[in-house]
Regions:
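N-terminal nucleophile
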Residues: 1-208
């Protein structure tokens, strides 16, 4: 599974995620391993996959297809293309492998980006997801923040932090503290943690 969060204000957009993933042995026992879940899409956009582990190969397949289709740079156009692409990929995975064990039947993708042609501040977040292996994936409303899986306490804290105009450095530190706390109480969440920002200067990986 994944613990991920993203948000933006006038100072920029940030993304943060853990790297622990779960697979199951032939006997149905969970095994944990680590993999990167956060990837740039061009210069000003990013995708963060979460939930079922298949989100990562689907994210990489989407990135490869976007790279192949030159000119697909606008985040809204990317999301419009990604919705059927990821739905088809997830459907093929389920047909081949069957449903995941109970409690692991969620997959989601956070799309983030900057577009100078949009009204200020020019940042966007989109969330595509599926619960209980539902197909096709759905576009889930997101305004200027996403916390997945949802955590009401963190959502309130992040809402206040964004509203007060905290700089990206402080928003990233809040995210780091949250991820570390979740790793202490949830075995499916763990380091290393990955962070990135998107500003008018583009996508940037951050080390904390």
């Amino acid at each position: 599974m994944t613990q991920a969060l993203a948000g933006f204000n006038a100072n920029g957009l940030f993304l943060a995620t853990d790297s622990r993933a779960t697979r199951f042995t032939a006997g149905g026992q969970p095994e944990f391993f680590h993999l990167q879940k956060l990837f740039p899409l061009g210069e000003n956009c990013a995708i963060l996959g979460g939930g079922a582990g298949v989100s990562v190969p689907l994210s990489l397949a989407l990135r490869q297809e976007i790279d192949r289709r030159r000119g697909l740079n606008d985040l809204e156009e990317i999301v419009e293309f990604a919705l059927p692409f990821l739905s088809q990929g997830y459907g093929a995975y389920l047909r081949h492998h069957g449903p995941e064990p109970e409690g692991f039947r969620r997959v989601y993708f956070i799309f983030a980006g900057y577009d100078p042609a949009m009204p200020p501040p020019g940042y966007q977040l989109f969330l595509l997801g599926s619960e209980d292996n539902e197909l096709p994936l759905r576009l889930i409303p997101a305004v200027n923040q996403v916390v997945m899986p949802r955590n009401l306490g963190m959502e309130m804290r992040l809402h206040q932090a964004l509203a007060t105009g905290l700089p990206l450095e402080q928003l990233l530190q809040i995210s780091k503290d949250f991820l570390e706390k979740q790793a202490q109480i949830k075995e499916e969440v763990g380091p290393p943690f990955y962070y990135a920002t998107i500003t008018a200067a583009g996508y940037r990986e951050i080390t904390l």
